[in-house]
Amino acid sequence: MKKKILITKHFPDETLESFKSSFDFLVPKPSFVPMSRFEVLSIKGKIEGIINSAELKVDNEILNKFPSLKIISNISIGTDNLDLELLSKKRIWATNTPLSFVNSTADCTMAFILILARRLRQADIYVRKNLWPNDGFTPGMWDGNLLSGKTLGIIGYGNIGKAVARRAKSFGMKIIFTKKNISRSKNYRSLNDLLRISDFISLHAPLTDDSYHLLN
């Protein structure tokens, strides 16, 4: 008998196809809308695995609903939605994908910094409104600011923070960072010093009680 796997959010059909000989997949309908907690708790049957994009908070209520559960796979970097201590007690495997979005997130972060520094959003609107030839354009009007020589303060220096730093260095930026339990690096600064010194600040800390509402 095939094992039943619950997938709480859209997953590419071509990816699932190669596993259908061994598993039955329960997927959301419509597929592009994540399952609500109510929908998950309404499912009947022996579920042995859950593939989740971190929308579903997995707690005692969920685990009691699916007593045959053996593994929960988070398609995300974080595990904030999982009660890891409880899963360990119940001997249920928990996995995540810590490196899957590192480069994508770092690329987007660098793009946002460029958009801000070079005023690309404002310039784009200016051109699309056809103001370019009629509104007194002057050279340098949308130049913005150089990144070279500017200081980027990174809050949270894990895989993503380091990937952002590598990209920023290629633009000639100076890198400082703050991270819990690290204070010996010459680039380390306290949070207050980082906020005072930085020209740009990029936040990449995991969500914890300490980081919740860290910046307003």
Predicted regions and their residues:
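Glycine-rich Rossmann-fold phosphate-binding loop(s) that bind the pyrophosphate
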Residues: 157-158
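Short gly/ser/thr-rich secondary-structure transition/capping motifs
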Residues: 30-35, 53-54, 131-139, 181-188, ...
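Rossmann-like adenosine-cofactor binding region
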Residues: 48, 58-62, 174, 180-216
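Short beta-strand elements at the ligand-binding edges of bilobed clamshell
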Residues: 93-99, 188-191
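An N-terminal-biased, well-structured beta-alpha scaffold segment characteristic
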Residues: 1-95, 194-196
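Residue-level detector of anion-binding/catalytic polar loops
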Residues: 24-25, 93, 115, 119, ...
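Phosphate-binding beta-alpha-beta segment of Rossmann-like dinucleotide-binding domains, i.e.
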Residues: 98-151, 163-166
